[in-house]
Amino acid sequence: MITLKEALKLSKDEILALRKELKDKILKTKDLGAYIEQLTGEDLNESGSGIPIAIKDNIQVKNWSVTSASNILQGYVAPYDATVITKLRSAGFAPFGRTNMDEFAMGSTTESSFYGKTLNPTDYSRVPGGSSGGSAAAVAAGIAVAALGSDTGGSIRQPAAFCGCVGFKPTYGRVSRYGLAAYSSSLDQIGPITQNVTDAAILFDVIAGYDKMDSTSYSKEFISTADKLNSDRKLTIAVIENFVNETKDEVKSALLKTIEKLKSAGHKIIYKNLLNSKYNIAAYYIIATAEASTNLSRYDGVRYGNRAKASNLNELYANTRSAGFGEEVQRRMLLGTFVLSSGYYDAYYIKAQKARAYIKKEYEKILDEADLIFMPIAPSVAYKFGELANPLDAYLSDVYTIGVNLAGLPAISVPIAKNSENLNISAQLIGRAYDEQTVLDGALNLEKIIKG
């Protein structure tokens, strides 16, 4: 598939030909489940203009059906463009196709979608990761030039890692969340999934910047990164030794080899440890589910979306939510409601917020001594469907990504190796808040080292 950088040089006729080619490929690969079944209308308008960018199904695109892969939003049509979509259009890009996802971005396998699961292009028996699994699978399968996803606890980086592409989560507040269906408002962040690091920088530059429509948007002027990329910068990189040592043998081996390559390339490597990852999991799932229980309370069948039959208002709420929300979403909403209840608020939610502050300080302390942090994306390669049937086991697959969201830092997933079964292994680079340039420079150098 043509890269985003190459696509910028195309004429209008060549872009039209690219859109037609993509539409044909998407229709021929429906079994992959990367795109939601609705393959007609403006979302795949081959006669439109603009370089095509695949869009996760929780980002508002005017006149599109946008459902967050949930039954409860069937029939909802977005009345406006999200800020990132407005920015795409202004820069000569265009939304092109809705990608599949875990329902309301709650999951790490893209199995909980109302539309059915997405497969991993490398091995159809394995998960593509999630929740932005459709976006990652589309890019990896060559049926998207690039895509937008959202990352609440690793939902861009982990599927990018499992599918073998680049996934970039900007600093919290760097990219506007206006028009993103909220899961956890203090953790959600939109970002690119691309074929390479340069493309990630290009797409990031398009969508980044202050937005008055988002109260959490970073107000300082954004300075573009793509035109300043430097793959020759020598950096101090902190390896999180305890996290590397916890991973499965094949992942650990690939990470250790990559560390040696970084040393050989002239980077200074220091070794650090972070707080036991179980604290990240506990704090994240308390905070995220608490915010989700509030955010998803707006879906009641009254104003928009699917509505169940009922004889009174309470019955309408109960029936609509019972039929509209999937099992995982209901589980997280119940957990969130529980931790916010009067008897448990201090015991759980307040403690989780204190833990979050401590986790953030830990990352910042390491980044006072280093330019970047190096750690795994996941403990293993992509696992088989049904392998992690217990929800708690599935939650642990995000163990190395969620801390970054709790700290609000920028991070990128870069492919570093394949195992004996040709499955992808990636590493994660994390930087200081709002210093995306260093993250992208380090990632570009790592990409160059790996590709030789």
From Swiss-Prot:
<keyword id="KW-0436">Ligase</keyword>
<keyword id="KW-0648">Protein biosynthesis</keyword>
<comment type="function">
    <text>Allows the formation of correctly charged Gln-tRNA(Gln) through the transamidation of misacylated Glu-tRNA(Gln) in organisms which lack glutaminyl-tRNA synthetase. The reaction takes place in the presence of glutamine and ATP through an activated gamma-phospho-Glu-tRNA(Gln).</text>
</comment>
<dbReference type="InterPro" id="IPR036928">
    <property type="entry name" value="AS_sf"/>
</dbReference>
<dbReference type="GO" id="GO:0030956">
    <property type="term" value="C:glutamyl-tRNA(Gln) amidotransferase complex"/>
</dbReference>
<dbReference type="Pfam" id="PF01425">
    <property type="entry name" value="Amidase"/>
</dbReference>
<dbReference type="GO" id="GO:0050567">
    <property type="term" value="F:glutaminyl-tRNA synthase (glutamine-hydrolyzing) activity"/>
</dbReference>
<keyword id="KW-0067">ATP-binding</keyword>
<dbReference type="InterPro" id="IPR000120">
    <property type="entry name" value="Amidase"/>
</dbReference>
<dbReference type="InterPro" id="IPR004412">
    <property type="entry name" value="GatA"/>
</dbReference>
<dbReference type="GO" id="GO:0005524">
    <property type="term" value="F:ATP binding"/>
</dbReference>
<feature type="active site" description="Charge relay system">
    <location>
        <position position="56"/>
    </location>
</feature>
<dbReference type="GO" id="GO:0006412">
    <property type="term" value="P:translation"/>
</dbReference>
<dbReference type="InterPro" id="IPR020556">
    <property type="entry name" value="Amidase_CS"/>
</dbReference>
<dbReference type="InterPro" id="IPR023631">
    <property type="entry name" value="Amidase_dom"/>
</dbReference>
<comment type="subunit">
    <text>Heterotrimer of A, B and C subunits.</text>
</comment>
<comment type="similarity">
    <text>Belongs to the amidase family. GatA subfamily.</text>
</comment>
<keyword id="KW-0547">Nucleotide-binding</keyword>
<feature type="active site" description="Charge relay system">
    <location>
        <position position="131"/>
    </location>
</feature>
<protein>
    <recommendedName>
        <fullName>Glutamyl-tRNA(Gln) amidotransferase subunit A</fullName>
        <ecNumber>6.3.5.7</ecNumber>
    </recommendedName>
</protein>
<feature type="active site" description="Acyl-ester intermediate">
    <location>
        <position position="155"/>
    </location>
</feature>
